[in-house]
């Protein structure tokens, strides 16, 4: 009887220990899951996405005429009578005369469809990458900030590049009455699915450094201004930071955009070879046949487009973030 009682007591003790271990394991699992969920939720902020979406739509719409003139100027060598677009004011007059005021906004609908999501994804992913690379106290090095910007650029352009191809064809080649559906069918019919990704490598090489430099310039200027000049800057301050960062970035990286547009717009039958085989080949041929200055064709309207675009983009983004955070 004594032995049986002792065995029963031992079994009860073992069961209690097992229950304690199970509770401890469940507690640990719950804590780990909660920590992972919390970390994930702190990395990704929906406010970044929606603020970026609004900023992209507004800024692109306001600068649509300059965007069209810039692209026409970049690819004038491909177009018949393309030289009529090589000066800003005359280009405005030509477009209005031939197509009316609406011609200045040709392709803007698809431009918005592309610019809105691209801006949303870029700000959303940049916020996540930046928080991922930040120190516990919130500080972040210049290198990590550039990495976050470059990564956000790659993600955004990879997901929206087909829209960029469609937008460029509507803006430059397609007739005024062309629809997104018709242009999409035409690209697929003539070039296949690969046609929607023509120029993607150049696009990534373009946007990755642009986003890296643009975000880094913007946040550095903002940070240093608040640290040494104005601790409480006015509401319009983001537009000034954005204008400066956009101008600096454009000057450094503009040639990549020219090459990307040239590659995207070269047309050829299936029995013919393309004008440019790849990104490097395009740079060599452009500089050899047209000179280095060809890589900067359209930079003046580009300044007039990019500087206001980046300026408005950051201004609207910061304003939207402030409004969302107050709710």
UniProtKB/Swiss-Prot annotation:
Region (Disordered), start-end ranges: 1-36
Cell location: Mitochondrion inner membrane
Pfam family, one: Mito_carr
GO molecular function: nucleotide transmembrane transporter activity
Transmembrane segments: 49-66, 107-127, 146-166, 193-213, 239-259, 304-324
Mitochondrial matrix side: 67-106, 167-192, 260-303
Membrane topology classification: Multi-pass membrane protein
Superkingdom to which the source organism belongs: Eukaryota
Any single GO BP term: adenine nucleotide transport
Record-linked PROSITE patterns: SOLCAR
Gene3D superfamilies with a match to the protein in the record: Mitochondrial carrier domain (1.50.40.10)
Keyword tags: Membrane, Mitochondrion, Mitochondrion inner membrane, Repeat, Transmembrane, Transmembrane helix, Transport
One Gene Ontology cellular component annotation held by this UniProt entry: mitochondrial inner membrane
Topological region Mitochondrial intermembrane: 1-48, 128-145, 214-238, 325-327
Solcar repeats: 43-132, 140-224, 233-323
Family the UniProt entry places it in: Belongs to the mitochondrial carrier (TC 2.A.29) family.
PANTHER family for the chain: SOLUTE CARRIER FAMILY 25
Functional summary from the UniProt entry: Calcium-dependent mitochondrial solute carrier. Mitochondrial solute carriers shuttle metabolites, nucleotides, and cofactors through the mitochondrial inner membrane.
Protein name, UniProt field: Mitochondrial substrate carrier family protein A
Organism in which the protein naturally occurs: Dictyostelium discoideum
């Amino acid at each position: 009887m004594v032995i049986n009682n002792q065995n029963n007591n031992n079994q009860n003790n073992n069961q209690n220990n097992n229950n304690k271990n199970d509770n401890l394991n469940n507690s640990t699992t719950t804590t780990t899951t909660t920590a992972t969920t919390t970390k994930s939720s702190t990395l990704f902020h929906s406010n970044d996405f929606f603020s970026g979406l609004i900023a992209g739509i507004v800024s692109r719409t306001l600068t649509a005429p300059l965007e069209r003139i810039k692209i026409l100027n970049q690819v004038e060598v491909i177009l018949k009578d393309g030289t009529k677009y090589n000066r800003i004011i005359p280009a405005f007059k030509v477009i209005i005369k031939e197509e009316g005021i609406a011609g200045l906004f040709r392709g803007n609908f698809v431009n918005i469809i592309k610019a809105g999501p691209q801006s949303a994804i870029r700000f959303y992913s940049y916020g996540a990458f930046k928080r991922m690379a930040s120190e516990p106290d919130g500080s972040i090095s210049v290198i990590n900030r550039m990495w976050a910007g470059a990564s956000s650029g790659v993600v955004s352009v990879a997901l929206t590049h087909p829209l960029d191809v469609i937008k460029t064809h509507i803006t430059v080649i397609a007739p005024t009455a062309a629809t997104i559906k018709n242009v999409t069918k035409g690209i697929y019919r003539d070039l296949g699915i690969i046609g929607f990704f023509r120029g993607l490598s150049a696009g990534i090489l373009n946007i990755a450094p642009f986003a890296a430099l643009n975000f880094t310039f913007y946040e550095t200027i903002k940070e240093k201004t608040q640290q040494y000049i104005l601790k409480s800057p006015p509401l319009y301050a983001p537009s000034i930071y954005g204008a400066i960062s956009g101008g600096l970035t454009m000057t450094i990286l503009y040639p990549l955009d020219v090459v990307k547009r040239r590659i995207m717009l070269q047309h050829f039958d299936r029995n013919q070879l393309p004008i440019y085989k790849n990104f490097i080949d395009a740079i060599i041929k452009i500089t050899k046949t047209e000179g280095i200055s060809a890589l900067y064709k359209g930079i003046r309207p580009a300044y007039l487009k990019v500087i206001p675009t980046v300026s408005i983009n950051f201004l609207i983004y910061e304003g939207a973030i402030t409004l969302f955070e107050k709710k």
